[in-house]
A protein has these predicted regions:
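Conserved ATP-binding/catalytic segment of the ANL
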Residues: 503-505, 511-577
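Conserved structural elements of the adenylate-forming
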Residues: 183-188, 299-303, 331-352, 366-367, ...
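Gly/Ser/Thr-rich phosphate-binding loop
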Residues: 295, 378, 405-410, 419-479, ...
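Structural core segment of the AMP-binding/adenylate-forming
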Residues: 104, 111-112, 195, 223-293, ...
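Conserved AMP-binding/adenylate-forming core of the ANL superfamily
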Residues: 161-219, 236-241, 293-295, 335-336
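Conserved AMP-binding/adenylation subdomain of ANL enzymes
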Residues: 225, 339-359, 363-406, 421
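Conserved pre-ATP/AMP-binding loop-to-beta segment of ANL
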Residues: 160-163, 278-279, 285, 295-320, ...
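Conserved AMP-binding A3 loop
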Residues: 176-180, 309, 316-340
Length: 580
């Protein structure tokens, strides 16, 4: 009734660039009805927006500024029907500035911090701008640093009752660990491992899911100087055989959950060099029981007189990372690595010393070192750990309010699962800051989360071989879809195949210049078991990430892809050889 125009048959062409910009809004008298035929259409009316699919329609007062774009990677066909009850001719359409557009990103504000004396100041000199953002960073005597002794044990002395970890089991059992608890229990574990013949430089593979025992074992190995090898509990026999041999493992700590121990047993039939097998969170014939045995040992630990203190450039841990040819390589990190995550935790995660931080990651991946251990404890913050069997947004979302989680980090895949829930049904007001990394950030994820929480997702970039290199950090206004800017810790550049810097807007490979020294946090190379040491991956003074990006006129970096054939899945790098 009172239709004054034939339906317009509109083909909205998909534009990648439009996904990162405000929708251009127009207005005119009357009403409008849009009906989608194929594809996906994002329609914004005032500050409200909807994603429409085939068969969906929307009806609105067209005097309200409105606009639409095709989304989801393809063109969209739709009918646009304009109606006017008065029957007057349709006035000329006029474009308006998007003053009623979606809430815009805002600079990250500093969390409430106690600016008194902190343990990290003994090792780190952080020069900050007036707004609290990082201007420059220097390290004091990193060659003598040992995280377990110099942070955990010292925190146990300075603030013994301060919460270090709130752990939730798969059956929802709650356990609270103070820094004094972690110090004492890791001392027992260090003495236990030492009694089993594990010494400085020995490699120990950990397959522990998110069991609380992982943190105890890691600190114990840090104290002994044994090298932890991070591994997923999803590995099968062939994966384990390769890892045991490639890393020269002497011992394995394995979860009793699932089929993990059985797969290890199958692998050990071909790997007699792995002489010690320890089961965690259960008992099994032929295995030592970590939980039953380590508590019997002393709660104080001092290296033997004939053993040097592990520190500085001694190896700390290894993590397998995918390559395009052959099996995964073994990235190595030294005892200076945790210092690099000070930037990750303080200026990107915005860890509050009086808050509770949650990063979603299994301990078999380097992401756990980013958000579940080193940087957070270095900043004197507590970590929240939930040892779930399978990720469920509906299971995790109520925990933010229940446990007052203040900062949060996850890959885009997890955020997408969360957004599929009705976020309005959950109280997320405890979250002060949210970060995202691991894959390219879809603008829809950014806007949906912002709509539900009022928080801008702050994207960051790094690798298993590094700490955070590029990010939307404290004081920055994020550009949706951008990784942010390089942090002062790393001398980051974008280069062409000849190693020359490229100009604004040109795509090239992200590299780190190390001609002036190796930054704390950058891998010392890939481990070669035949030589018993890491082999440097630096070429002509550059560490090559294998990732490509371009840089805009404001210095923000925009991710493009890999220079090789690696595939990203839920934030993990997977090589084609592994898939075969």
């Amino acid at each position: 009734k009172n239709r004054i125009a034939e339906p317009l048959y509109v083909n909205a062409a998909y534009s990648q660039e439009a996904q990162y910009q405000d929708i251009e809004l127009t207005s005119h008298e009357g009403q409008e009805c849009d009906i989608v035929i194929s594809g996906k259409l994002k329609v914004q009316v005032g500050t409200h927006w909807e994603i429409l699919g085939p068969g969906d329609s929307i009806y609105y007062d067209s005097s309200t500024p409105h606009g639409m774009i095709a989304v989801d990677g393809g063109d969209c066909l739709f009918y646009a029907i304009v109606l006017n009850p008065s029957g007057e001719p349709i006035p000329e359409l006029t474009a308006r500035e998007p003053s009623m557009s979606l809430p815009q990103p805002a600079p990250a504000a500093a969390p409430r911090r106690d600016e008194g004396e902190h343990l990290w100041q003994r090792w780190i000199d952080a020069e900050e701008n007036p707004d609290g953002s990082l201007k420059a960073i220097r390290f004091k005597n990193p060659e003598h640093f040992n995280f377990a002794f110099d942070i955990v044990d010292e925190m146990a002395k300075a603030a013994p009752d301060k919460l270090a970890m709130l752990h939730i089991d798969r059956d929802k059992t709650e356990r609270r660990f103070t820094f004094a608890d972690i110090s004492r229990l890791s001392n027992r574990a260090a003495n236990y491992f030492h009694s089993l013949g594990i010494r400085k430089g020995d490699r120990v593979l950990l397959m522990l899911r998110r069991h609380y025992q992982f943190w105890i074992a890691m600190m114990a190995l840090n104290k002994i100087g044994a090298v932890a090898i991070l591994a997923s509990n999803q590995l099968l026999k062939k994966d384990l055989v390769y890892r045991f041999r490639a890393a020269g493992a002497k011992a394995v700590l394995c979860t009793a959950t699932g089929d993990c121990a059985h797969q290890v047993e199958l692998a050990l039939e071909e790997c007699p060099e792995v002489t010690t097998r320890i089961l965690v969170d259960g008992e099994r014939e032929g295995w030592r029981s970590f939980d039953e045995e380590y508590r019997m040992f002393r709660s104080t630990y001092t290296p033997m007189k004939n053993e040097s203190r592990p520190e500085g450039e001694d190896l700390l841990f290894m993590v397998f990372t995918s390559g395009t040819t052959g099996y995964p390589k073994i990235a190595t990190h030294t005892h200076t690595y945790p210092l690099g995550h000070f930037v990750t935790a303080r200026y990107w995660h915005m860890v509050d010393p009086n808050g509770l931080h949650l990063t979603i990651s299994d301990t078999g991946w380097a992401k756990a070192m980013w958000g579940k251990l080193y940087g957070q404890w270095l900043c004197e913050g507590a970590i929240f750990v939930y040892d779930f069997d399978r990720f469920s947004a509906a299971d995790i979302l109520p925990m933010f309010k229940k446990y007052n989680i203040t900062t949060f980090c996850a890959p885009p895949t997890m955020y997408r699962f969360m957004i599929k829930e009705d976020l309005g049904a959950y109280d997320l007001s405890s979250i002060h800051h949210a970060t995202i990394a691991g894959e390219a950030l879809n603008p829809e994820v950014f806007h949906q989360f912002k709509k539900a929480t009022g928080l801008s997702l702050m994207e960051g970039f790094g690798q298993s071989e590094t700490t955070m290199m590029i990010g939307n950090t404290l004081g920055m206004t994020p550009k949706v879809g951008s990784m942010g800017k390089p942090v002062p810790l790393y001398d980051v550049d974008i280069v062409n195949p000849d190693g020359q810097s490229v100009g604004v807007g040109e795509t090239g490979e992200i590299v780190v210049r190390v001609d002036k020294g190796m930054p704390c946090g950058l891998s010392r190379g890939y481990f070669d078991n035949a030589q018993g040491k890491p082999i440097s991956s630096v070429r002509n003074g550059l560490y090559h990430t294998g990732d490509t990006a371009w840089r805009d006129e404001d210095g923000y970096y925009w991710y493009v892809g890999r220079v090789d054939d690696l595939i990203k899945s839920s934030g993990y790098r997977i090589g084609p050889f592994e898939i075969e």
